[in-house]
Curated annotation (Swiss-Prot):
Gene from which the chain derives: MCMDC2
Domain spans labelled MCM: 533-621
Designated name of the protein: Minichromosome maintenance domain-containing protein 2
Organism: Homo sapiens (Human)
A GO biological-process term: late meiotic recombination nodule assembly
Pfam families, per database record: MCM_lid
InterPro entries: MCM, MCM_lid, P-loop_NTPase
């Protein structure tokens, strides 16, 4: 096909797609402007499928020779401007800068760039699609979008006019646009830039890793090798600030090689789309059957879930309280692009750190964004110099931002330094982290600061044996209060749930754990319990993925009970000297716990039975922090019996019903102005 035919096809596409009208509107803006322009920039939205259907050769040019395709549209647009007299000041075709923005690429393997596979096909300068998570980003800097050059010889006719226009093209460096060694084609004299016509644009550099590479941050290995490498993405103009650290995106762009200390493969982004993970349509048949069998009770299903959860790590029936809290925290994670505020942070007091570490590490692998923080790395963002020499500061994500919408497991609190623990406390209280950028250090005139939302739940544990060795045990004057002298009291308060899992607690049966450990040592891959074979890890992954996407709302009874318990607890835990021990976030945390229990039951409505579990868990945590009060809750209130069969589940339901009556009485006594309705009313 001749070049003329392709231009004709381009014009037809612009007319049919509405691009021609948008082009005319943009021209009107330039024509009405009082400013003089050397370069007129136009953005054209291209749907490759529509173009290929209209004209195969033009479509092929767009997909595989995008720079030549841009020249075709440039010629068409120049003819349109001259024919319709759209811009009076326009003199030459080179003044028109066409940017083709693609809506998508064909879903074929040859158009994908997998960062975990080698080698990468980056030699052909055409469009590819890649998917990844942002792990670093720079501040915004300027680049030269376009410039006007004139011949230095005043006698040369090209010392005037707009014959020498240079614009940025994908993959080009700054020196390709602005240099001092350009020569005149007519007289071979050097060209000089007319600086008053230089056009600047915004530029930002981000680094992404493939989603599969998150396995390196999850503390789990299936002995399958994979390639781990970050890829640098250049964002320009309207693409700037469209990517956030921790989010996952699909990126269409053109690969290029940039030479720093070594040659690096980079991508010039053309279009960016946020990735929303697919919501599973349901749960496994085994869980569906279990849900049906326990439908008569609001408590049985979650009790059985906690009982059989992580049977590969710890035998069924052990650590039920902790496992229920872990499941509730997992079900509050999200894969959506929304602010995650309903985080459930968990701090565990234990003497068996190895088993707790394994249990938590197993749990974070059940959600897409479960991150195991390594002590050698940073929890929160850090600053470094940009390796591409653009003068921008590079902000590295850290484990917390990488765990966006998920869980950040930070290990033993005692392994972190004092300043990091203070930073953690601030983040737990504010749910944000502010990064200060000293201008003097990074070559800027002024200091800057950037604030990032921290949208993940934090899990950690404290070794009580370590605490007793380093600090003398303090004598607790309050019943039920736990010795947490190793860590600052304010940090303990910042964690929503404090769970006791030491040898003196009812959730630490000794003999079954020893037997399980010995069996695992003999047969690491063995499944020793019927629950492990009937309810697999994949079943739990599917259950959590389905449950966390449920939209839940409070019933009137549940809402009143939540507010009533909060007011009553705040009243009895208020001292004359230090005021209330309940923080302002306590009510919010009770709401999150209630929602989590409802989601785990696969319900869309929060009932007062969910609020009871939330209140018992929260009161147990408060007792460990501050000691018992009038509403005295046993340490094993949520799991008063070992769950062996249906009879024990029925006994637990009766016990929890009594607890609910006690809670209602407590609210009626200490929560004035709060009405609690009985089922009859």
């Amino acid at each position: 096909m001749s070049n003329l035919k392709m231009k004709e096809a381009a014009l037809i596409y612009l007319d049919r797609s509405g691009g021609l009208q948008k082009f005319i509107d943009d021209c009107k803006y330039y024509n009405d402007s009082k400013q003089s322009y050397a370069v007129y920039r136009f953005k054209i939205l291209i749907n490759p499928s529509d173009v290929v259907e209209l004209d195969a050769e033009l479509g092929n040019h767009i997909l595989h020779q995008p720079l030549k395709a841009a020249e075709v549209f440039q010629s068409v647009c120049f003819i349109a401007v001259k024919t319709l007299s759209l811009i009076g000041q326009l003199q030459t075709e080179t003044q028109i800068n066409i940017v083709l923005k693609l809506t998508h690429l064909p879903p074929l393997p040859s158009y994908g760039l997998d960062l975990c596979e080698f080698p990468l096909d980056y030699t052909s300068q055409r469009f590819y699609m890649m998917q990844g998570i942002v792990i670093a980003m720079t501040t915004i800097t300027k680049y030269t979008q376009g410039a006007r050059f004139l011949c230095s010889d005043e006698a040369c006719p090209l010392s005037k006019g707009f014959q020498y226009i240079r614009v940025h093209v994908p993959g080009a460096t700054e020196s390709a646009t602005i240099r001092n060694d350009f020569l005149c084609n007519l007289c071979a004299s050097s060209l000089q830039e007319d600086r008053k016509f230089r056009v600047l644009g915004d530029k930002q550099i981000v680094e992404i890793i493939a989603t599969k590479a998150l396995r390196a941050f999850q503390g789990y290995s299936n002995n399958q090798p994979f390639r781990f490498q970050s890829l640098t993405i250049f964002l320009r103009d309207e693409s700037v600030n469209k990517m956030n650290i921790g989010n996952e995106y699909k990126i269409i762009g053109i690969p290029t090689c940039v030479k720093t200390s070594q040659t690096a493969v980079c991508i010039e982004a053309n279009s960016i789309t946020f990735c929303n993970s697919k919501v599973p349509s349901g749960i496994s048949d085994n869980f569906r059957c279990l849900l049906s069998l326990t439908s008569s009770s609001c408590w049985k299903f979650t009790a059985i879930l906690a009982n059989i959860f992580a049977s590969q790590i710890t035998p069924p029936g052990t650590y039920n309280l902790l496992k229920l809290c872990l499941l509730m925290s997992l079900v509050q994670t999200t894969d959506r692009n929304k602010e995650l505020e309903d985080c459930l942070d968990i701090l565990i007091i234990t003497s068996d750190t190895l088993l707790i570490d394994r249990l938590l590490n197993f749990s974070i692998n059940l959600v897409p964004r479960g991150i195991r923080h390594l002590v050698s790395t940073e929890i929160f963002p850090t600053l470094s110099r940009n390796k591409y020499g653009t003068g921008a500061v590079s902000i590295q994500a850290g484990s917390a931002l990488l765990a966006k919408g998920g869980i950040c497991f930070i290990g033993d609190l005692a392994s972190h330094k004092k300043d990091k623990l203070e930073q953690l406390q601030t983040v737990l209280e504010s749910r944000s982290i502010t990064v200060y950028i000293p201008g003097k250090k990074f070559g800027e005139d002024i200091d800057q600061q950037m604030t990032f939302p921290v949208q993940c739940s934090f899990w950690s544990f404290v070794d009580v044996d370590s605490s007793s060795r380093r600090n003398a045990q303090k004598i607790n004057t309050l019943i039920g209060q736990m010795d947490c002298s190793l860590i600052p009291a304010n940090l303990v308060e910042a964690f929503g749930l404090l769970i006791n899992c030491n040898e003196s607690s009812p959730c630490h049966p000794f003999l079954p754990t020893v037997q399980h450990t010995l069996n695992k040592a003999i047969n690491p891959e063995g499944l020793f319990y019927a629950a492990s074979r009937q309810f697999t890890t994949e079943d739990f992954e599917k259950l959590l993925a389905f449950a966390k996407n449920l939209n839940v709302e409070f019933s009137l009874e549940a809402e009143r009970m939540t507010h009533g318990y909060y007011l009553a607890s705040r009243r009895i835990r208020t001292g004359s000297v230090c005021g209330s021990k309940l923080s302002a976030s306590a009510l919010k945390y009770l709401v999150f716990l209630s929602e989590a229990h409802a989601r785990l039951n696969l319900r869309n409505k929060v009932l007062k039975e969910d609020v009871l579990i939330a209140a018992l868990l929260f009161e147990t945590s408060l007792t460990l922090k501050y000691g018992a009060t009038v509403f005295c809750v046993a340490p094993n209130a949520v799991f008063p019996f070992e769950l062996y069969n249906e009879e024990y589940l029925e006994q637990r339901d009766l016990y929890l019903t009594q607890c609910q009556q006690q809670l209602e009485q407590f609210i009626a006594t200490y929560g004035p102005g709060t009405t609690i309705f009985s089922s009859d009313e």
